């Protein structure tokens, strides 16, 4: 199921990995999770397309959820209404005990190195292939880095001018991460010829001072032709998450850190539930409590704002915070309003984070994270990110 050239070039990434005292096969895990979640992913993507193609007026198409709309709870297996979820947020903020009350990260505490308040600051992202990009990321004084398997690591092509012998960046970056975390580059230089000159790179920062790493997988819509299950391309989200967990959990755990992800392009609670199932299944496979893998979510889709309380609720065992950003959010607003003859499209070149609409966006994000992140009168269970 792994394309032969990928398997031959990166054999370390596949086959049986020893994780938390268990032997787990990478390909079998990708296949099992793909078979389980592929129908749900297809349904979620169909729902996206139906919204975009809907003939309903924009204001109706993107209306707030009904109070009696129900959502599946991955924790209890019961259904909650949107009213229950929002009331539970309010009860939590007010410190009021009730059956509806809920908050973030109540089961597995947030590690200090992943906590958005204990370890705040600049969050950098970029590809981890070529290797010097990964070295530069780890030598950075920034507190957090996202090895990027989304925007910066295209799986289907090599950029113009790339020699034919160069590997597919996704898998090369994954191999680089595995080797670095296992200490294979601690005392070794990486030498590469650039513009006719040999350049040498080293990791100069001790591992204890490296930025916290949050792997950024692709969105639900991306398929990997290099990994197939039952003759069909596997979802990139599943492939990357499985490869990252099974190849890196041991080394990250030994280093005193953990498995963390930055999730892009999330739009609805339906999509959040797919992610929660994926992560919970993997936690069960390696024998750690549900909620051990922590995540941040990029709130970069305007439609996600309608569902933000429910998205946070579905992910409450592991969500550290939701991140606001400008470029993708404005693009999503254009997509939402494209069919409205009265629509006014934002100009990303001129609208900054201090514009009134963007201030409202940031305040709303902060409000939801404040309501969900409070415990004993303090914001300890999560926090808004960015803005």
Place the predicted regions along the sequence by residue.
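Conserved alpha/beta-domain cores
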Residues: 2-12, 18-20, 25, 71, ...
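Glycine-rich loop at the start of a catalytic domain that most often binds anionic cofactors/ligands
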Residues: 58-82, 139-141, 158-177
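N-terminal active-site wall of soluble small-molecule enzyme domains
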Residues: 77, 84, 98-110, 116, ...
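Low-complexity, highly charged intrinsically disordered N-terminal segments
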Residues: 19-99
């Amino acid at each position: 199921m792994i394309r032969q050239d990928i398997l031959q070039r990166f054999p370390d990434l596949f086959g049986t990995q020893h994780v938390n005292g268990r032997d787990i096969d990478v390909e079998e895990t990708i296949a099992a999770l793909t078979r389980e979640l592929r129908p749900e992913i297809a349904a979620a993507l169909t729902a996206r397309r139906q919204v975009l193609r809907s003939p309903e007026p924009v204001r109706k198409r993107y209306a707030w959820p009904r109070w009696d709309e129900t959502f599946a709870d991955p924790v209890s297996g019961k259904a909650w209404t949107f009213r229950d979820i929002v009331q539970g947020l309010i009860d939590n903020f007010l410190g009021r005990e009730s059956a509806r009350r809920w908050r973030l990260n109540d089961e597995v505490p947030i590690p200090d190195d992943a906590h958005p308040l204990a370890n705040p600051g600049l969050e950098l992202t970029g590809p981890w292939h070529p290797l010097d990009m990964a070295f530069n990321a780890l030598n950075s004084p920034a507190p957090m880095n996202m090895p990027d398997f989304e925007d910066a690591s295209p799986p289907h092509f090599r950029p113009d001018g790339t020699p034919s012998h160069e590997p597919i960046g996704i898998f090369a970056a994954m191999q680089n991460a595995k080797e670095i975390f296992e200490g294979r580059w601690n005392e070794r230089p990486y030498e590469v010829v650039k513009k006719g000159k040999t350049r040498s790179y080293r990791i100069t920062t001790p591992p204890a001072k490296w930025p916290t790493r949050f792997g950024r997988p692709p969105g639900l819509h991306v398929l990997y032709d290099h990994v197939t299950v039952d003759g069909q391309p596997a979802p990139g989200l599943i492939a990357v998450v499985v490869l990252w967990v099974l190849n890196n959990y041991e080394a990250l755990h030994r280093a005193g850190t953990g498995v963390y992800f930055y999730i892009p392009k999330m739009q609805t609670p339906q999509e959040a539930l797919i992610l929660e199932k994926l992560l919970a299944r993997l936690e069960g496979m390696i024998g750690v409590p549900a909620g051990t893998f922590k995540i941040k979510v990029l709130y970069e889709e305007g439609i996600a704002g309608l569902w933000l309380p429910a998205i946070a609720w579905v992910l409450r065992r592991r969500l550290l915070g939701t991140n606001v950003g400008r470029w993708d959010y404005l693009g999503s607003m254009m997509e939402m309003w494209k069919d409205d003859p009265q629509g006014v499209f934002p100009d990303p070149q001129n609208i900054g984070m201090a514009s009134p609409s963007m201030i409202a966006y940031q305040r709303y994000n902060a409000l939801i994270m404040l309501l969900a992140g409070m415990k004993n009168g303090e914001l300890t269970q999560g926090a808004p990110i960015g803005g």
